[in-house]
Amino acid sequence: WDMTVLKVYDKYYSKAEKAVERLQKSTLEKSFIHNRLKEGNILFNYGRISIIDWDYMTVGSPLWDLAFFINRYKRKNAFYAHNKGLNYLNMEDILGAYSKNNYLTENQIEDLQAVIDYPRQFISVIGEIYRKSRKFIPVGLKMKLDEMAEQVDFEL
């Protein structure tokens, strides 16, 4: 697994640096956010939308929720659809749909892109491995590392 990390470390480090540099200039508005917004936490029932599982709720920018949702979609759906030659939503499609109900300024779009580009999952997995000084890592973490290595250059 060390070789997997070494192959992609520089790219993810560079993405993190650029994202942090952009976000330090940001003036993102803050409110309560879900912080783990994914398709399984959004329920549609009789024309109403409900969001469940608020156990990771925190204060932050609503753009963080949108970025988390987009990154999960990118990682779990778009990458594989792209490789199979199937249609998938690109960033323009996603932002177009989102903007129908939530106007985004150019600055907000740049901030959103920085949050999307920040390699949150990579940093989390690497942190978990190295914090515990593991000689052996569970299969699930190894699979996440392999997936991230495979997707490091994929953009929506």
Give the residues covered by each predicted segment.
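ATP-dependent phospho-/nucleotidyl transfer catalytic cores
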Residues: W1-F32, D93
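Short helix-capping and hinge/turn segments at secondary-structure transitions, especially at repeat
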Residues: S14, K18-E21, I42-L43, G47-S50, ...
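Active-site acidic catalytic loop and adjacent metal/ATP-binding pocket
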Residues: V20-W64
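Active-site activation/catalytic loop segments of kinase-like enzymes and analogous catalytic loops
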Residues: L63-Y103, I116-R134
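Helix N-cap / loop-to-helix initiation motif
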Residues: L104-Q108
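ATP/Mg2+ or Mg2+-diphosphate-binding catalytic cores
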Residues: F122-L156
